[in-house]
């Protein structure tokens, strides 16, 4: 009888989130000159109303490790900030309830700090791939990555805003992946679930609704080639199953 009981306890331990250390979440958000101010305000609203409240609900049963990092024209070397909630096993319930509120306030304050710094530096371009590469290097374990950006990589690697790319052709997308491998190296997204929200069709003829399905295919293929999985893609974080 002892063997089945031991196996059951081991199974239980492995499935209790707080016994496996913090759950890792990373939020990468387009800031500085990578997105207009009103768009950044929209991302902040998404964080305040659609993302952070859902993450905060986990705090009473799970230790959460949240990394916030900007997507800019120099995403790979951009500073990141880490917030970690208390271990629920060793923290009184009333303190965990307080931690839920503190966590959300600190995350928004951190967003504002990162935005201020990114605006001051104002590096042109939108390096989503560089941000994903940095996120992969920060990851300590299986985790979840939320990208808040319009979806258009604009860097030395490529300009997805260019409708002449013919991105709907698989061979074109594969050629871009080969360029990423050669110049930067693919991100290491093994065991990472990625969700991209904030997607837009753009404001002019270069970025129209016909282009966006091809851009989704590109990101899906890049993330898969990097060992990760694209689990959500759309205009709002509500498409992300891990929230």
Report each predicted region and the residues it spans.
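Short, Lys/Arg-enriched N-terminal segments with co-localized hydrophobic residues
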Residues: 1-4
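Hydrophobic alpha-helical targeting segments used for export or membrane insertion
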Residues: 6-18
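Von Willebrand factor
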Residues: 21-141, 143-148
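P/S/T/G-enriched low-complexity
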Residues: 23-29, 190-192, 196-243
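Extracytoplasmic/secreted cell-surface and envelope-processing proteins
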Residues: 35-41, 75-80, 153-158, 204-207, ...
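Well-ordered, non-membrane alpha-helical segments in soluble/globular domains
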Residues: 40-53, 125-133, 165-181, 209-219
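VWA/integrin I-like adhesion module and closely mimicked acidic/polar interface patches used
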Residues: 152-211
